[in-house]
């Protein structure tokens, strides 16, 4: 009996005309393995990178298509190559770095070396040593190239396919999806930040979630309360072909009210007691002539293109086994801006250390309402990663520009966010302090955060370093700038409480 027939027996599909699907499609390991071959390696296209991420010849990025590791590289001034990230000799990982620049890829195991197009060029001891050993006489390097993949570029987005007979990328996308991508990527972009989070669910659930416009104004309190995205606005759902690709959109300026509809239903999403102390986060400007202010586009199976007002991002979905997936966020903009910063110098260790002790204790003891008081009124708070700092990405996983925004974040945590009950414990490292001539103190301290769940399960949640600016105020020392630089670029699930 074929594998398909076995799955057909194990997974009981409903009768024709019923829209519900068996829950087993999200939990069946055999189906997951089948998806890797028939779907991700089938006649489709998978997003892997933006061209701006690998601008120079030799620049590369490693990624995954399904759960298969791949490399995409700029192999010449006007072309890209991609191949499976496994040596053709023994299948070991060829490239361990996430990004970089090379003129060749050499396997560390046996030193087989490949050019930028994946062609095998050199084999260590090809002819043996001192006349002994070596490869067989009929060994040809051209027979042992890497598994090459098709690459096509559309509006600066790089897609790859395992199927060399797959239709061209633009045909795969379809006219409606292609038009929306052109709308978003009408100009060259600049990458602002890239971060990832691990989610404990089957990858298909996330792709279905972004297509589910039913939940958006019911679950997301900020969207409904502050009229960012509501059912009372003009909008809709656009499907392409068989419905695998989609766009859900709304136009904020067309809101007809509708608050009574939410209130009469007793829905949590409409919360008139939820107010912002700093509403700059809601301010936006018309960036597109069509008036669309909220658009989520899903390109099946692994890409989401986001426009939430002026917040633009790509989301890359990577399966991590049948019960997990990783979501990579790539934020971008199409004009270059950078804010200058001023750093200081000199020692104030004996005064600064108690500030950090009190800061960590405030979070660990869940006194979250007091957390914003550690900051100046005009301040900068950011959670980012070492990888993002290395690449000079200006935005973070979390970012606030005033004490008001910090207060709003705590209110959101209490009123809008839904998450499993958990507690945290900070472990603080060595403190390094110096002050500038204008009185601004620059401080740096390592930290680790342990997370304790309701079940009692205890785990290392985050580790990193704070890079801060501290100033003297009438109330004492306060943070003017606090940047938490995380060691890992992948966060387990999400960050809710302060770091």
Predicted regions and their residues:
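Short, contiguous pre-domain boundary segments
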Residues: 8-23
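Non-catalytic accessory segments flanking enzyme active sites
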Residues: 19-21, 25-65, 70-71
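Rieske [2Fe-2S] iron-sulfur-binding domain
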Residues: 54-164, 171, 175
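Generic beta-strand structural signal
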Residues: 64, 74, 114, 152-153, ...
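C-terminal catalytic domain of Rieske-type non-heme iron oxygenases
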Residues: 149-342, 346
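Short, low-complexity N-terminal intrinsically disordered segments enriched in polar/charged residues
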Residues: 343-365, 373-377
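A solvent-exposed, acidic/Ser-Thr-rich amphipathic alpha-helical stretch
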Residues: 377-446
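A beta-strand edge to alpha-helix "cap/lid" segment located at domain peripheries
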Residues: 432-499
């Amino acid at each position: 009996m074929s594998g398909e027939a076995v799955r057909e027996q194990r997974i009981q599909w409903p009768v024709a005309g019923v829209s519900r699907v068996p829950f087993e499609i999200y939990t069946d390991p055999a189906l997951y393995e089948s998806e890797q071959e028939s779907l991700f390696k089938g006649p489709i296209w998978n997003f892997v990178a933006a061209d701006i991420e690998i601008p120079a010849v030799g620049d590369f990025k490693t990624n995954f298509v399904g759960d298969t590791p791949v490399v995409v590289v700029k192999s010449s001034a006007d072309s890209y190559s991609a191949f499976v990230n496994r040596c053709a000799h023994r299948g070991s990982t060829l490239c361990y770095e996430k990004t970089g620049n090379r003129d060749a890829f050499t396997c560390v195991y046996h030193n087989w070396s490949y050019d930028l197009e994946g062609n095998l060029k050199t084999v260590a001891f090809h002819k043996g040593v001192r006349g002994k050993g070596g490869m067989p006489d009929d060994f040809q390097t051209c027979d042992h190239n890497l598994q090459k993949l098709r690459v096509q570029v559309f509006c600066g987005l790089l897609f790859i396919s395992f199927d060399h007979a797959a239709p061209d990328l633009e045909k795969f996308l379809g006219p409606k999806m292609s038009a929306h991508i052109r709308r978003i990527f009408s100009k060259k972009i600049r990458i602002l930040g890239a971060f990832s989070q691990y989610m404990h669910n089957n990858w298909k659930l996330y792709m279905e979630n972004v297509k589910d416009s039913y939940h958006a104004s019911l679950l997301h309190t900020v969207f409904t309360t502050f009229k960012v995205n509501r059912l009372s606005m003009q909008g809709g759902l656009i499907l392409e072909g068989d419905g695998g690709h989609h766009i859900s959109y709304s136009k904020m300026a067309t809101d007809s009210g509708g608050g009574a509809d939410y209130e009469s239903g007793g829905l949590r999403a409409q919360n008139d007691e939820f107010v912002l102390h700093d509403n700059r986060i809601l301010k936006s400007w018309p960036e597109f002539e069509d008036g669309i202010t909220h658009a989520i586009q899903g390109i099946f199976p692994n890409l989401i293109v986001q426009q939430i007002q002026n917040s633009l991002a790509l989301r890359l979905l990577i399966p991590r086994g049948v019960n997990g997936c990783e979501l990579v966020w790539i934020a971008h903009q199409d004009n270059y801006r950078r804010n200058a910063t001023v750093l200081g110098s000199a020692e104030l260790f004996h005064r600064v250390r108690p500030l950090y002790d009190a800061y960590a204790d405030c979070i660990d003891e869940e006194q979250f309402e007091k957390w914003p008081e550690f900051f100046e009124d005009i301040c900068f708070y950011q959670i980012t990663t070492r990888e993002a700092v290395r690449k000079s990405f200006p935005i973070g996983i979390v970012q606030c520009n005033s004490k008001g925004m910090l207060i709003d974040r705590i209110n959101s945590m209490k009123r809008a966010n839904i998450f499993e009950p958990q507690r945290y414990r900070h472990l603080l490292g060595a403190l390094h302090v110096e002050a500038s001539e204008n009185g601004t103190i620059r401080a740096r301290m390592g930290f680790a955060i342990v997370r304790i769940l309701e079940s009692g399960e205890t785990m290392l949640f985050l580790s990193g370093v704070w890079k801060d600016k501290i100033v003297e105020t009438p109330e004492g020392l306060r943070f003017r700038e606090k940047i938490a630089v995380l060691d890992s670029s992948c966060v387990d699930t999400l960050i809710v409480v302060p770091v």
